Amino acid sequence: MATCADILRSEFPEIDGQVFDYVTGVLHSGSADFESVDDLVEAVGELLQEVSGDSKDDAGIRAVCQRMYNTLRLAEPQNQGNNQVLLDAPIQLSKIMENYDCDTKLPGLLKREQSSTVNAKKLEKAEARLKAKQEKRSEKETLKTSSPLVLEEASASQAGSRKESRLESSGKNKSYDVRIENFDVSFGDRVLLAGADVNLAWGRRYGLVGRNGLGKTTLLKMLATRSLRVPAHISLLHVEQEVAGDDTPALQSVLESDTIREDLLRQERGLSLKIAAGRAEGSEAALLAEVYTKLEEIEADKAPARASVILAGLGFTPKMQQQPTREFSGGWRMRLALARALFARPDLLLLDEPTNMLDVRAILWLENYLQTWPSTILVVSHDRNFLNAIATDIIHLHSQRLDGYRGDFETFIKSKQERLLNQQREYEAQQQYRQHIQVFIDRFRYNANRASQVQSKLKMLEKLPELKPVDKESEVVLKFPDGFEKFSPPILQLDEVDFYYDPKHIIFSRLSVSADLESRICVVGENGAGKSTMLKLLMGDLAPVRGIRHAHRNLKIGYFSQHHVEQLDLNVSAVELLARKFPGRPEEEYRHQLGRYGISGELAMRPVASLSGGQKSRVAFAQMTMPCPNFYILDEPTNHLDMETIEALGHALNNFRGGVVLVSHDERFIRLVCKELWVCEKGSVTRVEGGFDQYRALLQEQFRREGFL
């Protein structure tokens, strides 16, 4: 029998993930509230009407609600009467007892503890209506509701310094360095950092690196929310959420991020109006002169030009800079959030994977721009070349601690290897010394003449510092299954293809490209140039307006979307996710498949929502490779992956026996995998014979012509 979730997915295939989570949460938590289908229509009908657009009228929405209401009633436990239910299959008690683990909660209990986060603004009306209904009926009965999935939140604690507290409270602390010592960060029961120290010197640019899931993003959030003590006089900005869409033009939105300038302009307008109306007092004229002086000091008149340069560098055309923010997609609004942060120039700028939202051109511009950044930056990035370009220092998060290194990423790699080698040598030397002393103690322990020497040696052992063996990070190894028979070309090609959604805006004209099982093709180009559209044409998800797509009859494509997280059910475990996608296989097979991509042990059983961005990507890879494709089409596969996994992914693709076409902005990854480089621009795709070096040189020359360098 179909569940309410199944009905929602079948009737509204385009339903937003947050709306889906909210509606299913209402259905399950408020099922006791619904005495009739009218109650259910009142609770979620209006929301479903918005989701359906014009595809369903009121009667259609009511019919869907009737199906879900019937499903809820059938799912209720029947404690009275002798109702008989026909089972789908016989129950084998012996197998149930074999699989039952007394220490493991039953699935039904687990679901009660799960929840989903919902966009409160978007669903405010529906929530208010449901709340009123629940309050009205609370006097009649006690409702048994299951709570929505609330993810664990991070917490931080740190040792306080009386001296720093006194300086802070007295206002005498004028330093812009950030020093946080002996602090802990936890995420639920997991300890991410223990007794850690972080020192951010003013004007330095720090790259924060480490494996997926260790707590880099959490550390940024702890700093941004000041859960870790950052001096109050230090302004900071954390680029995390996209800009809210409204009627404000993009350029004006950036200008408004400078609150000091906006406040001065507001004062200037108010004072000028008073003076013009003849209502000003003598002191207000002096105050206006003071405001003008301050505006001149911060070069307020040059602000629009500076904001425009930042927006242009991030890919906003002059026309786009005048568009209302509500007209931009989520990716462009994230760029807008980055532009606002760059324009505001905070004392401490916190960036979390800024290159994920950018194309190669914008990344190169950002590298150049940040190299002259006047204050402090802490950036989480897995883009090796980006860190080499902008970082003056590297902070390595591992083993629940933070280690600092001077220099860019390549310098960090060399220094880390030397440090580990020295630590190993010191550990081995001490172990050898301990063994030497222990041999003496064991030999003369019962010799009365040597008793004093034995005691001396024992004290010597006790005083030796306890050195731990070097904690080496495990090597990441990925392998794509390739147990398939190779076949002859042509494999996949587009011939003279035209494509557009609107005839007035042609995306591709007479596009001709081809790929075979030996291909290692990387597609680059500015955002909006049509890279993802071309991938969908190659896959057959989009049909050409004119022209032909040829695909070999044995071709089996595996597709990785840059929006893969949106396509995962975040409320179930990775094992359950694969079981739903590929039913009928033993659990060990799902676990083995996930283990290939580093999702093993308890990670495989945790809700996908609780995994880090990189771990979610690994789950998506496990799902993509389960059917053993012979050709991969990958759209930004390195987003959120740590450097070791990116490296392993590159080697896995090189060893794969099938074909690969991918879109990426990661320079090192492109150089590692790419045999052909295609540039997507102006409605066509061009092969660059000189590879990435030639493409980078073309972009740098373009920057010089446009005055960015």
Curated annotation (Swiss-Prot):
GO terms for biological process: defense response to virus. Residues 178-424, 492-707 form the ABC transporter domain. It holds the Pfam family ABC_tran_Xtn. Residues 129-171 are annotated as: Disordered. The modification Phosphoserine is found at S155, S157, S161, S283. InterPro entries: AAA+_ATPase, ABC_tran_Xtn, ABC_transporter-like_ATP-bd, ABC_transporter-like_CS, ABCF_EF3_subfamily, P-loop_NTPase. GO terms for molecular function: ATP binding; ATP hydrolysis activity. The keyword ATP-binding applies. Keywords: Acetylation, Antiviral defense, ATP-binding, Nucleotide-binding, Phosphoprotein, Repeat. The modification N-acetylalanine is found at A2. ATP 1 binds at G210, R211, N212, G213, L214, G215, K216, T217. CDD domains: ABCF_EF-3. Residues 129-143, 161-171 have a biased composition (Basic and acidic residues). The keyword Oxidoreductase does not apply. ATP 2 binds at G525, E526, N527, G528, A529, G530, K531, S532. Signal peptide: none annotated. Displays an antiviral effect against flaviviruses such as west Nile virus (WNV) in the presence of OAS1B. Belongs to the ABC transporter superfamily. ABCF family. EF3 subfamily. This is ATP-binding cassette sub-family F member 3. The lineage of its organism: Eukaryota, Metazoa, Chordata, Craniata, Vertebrata.
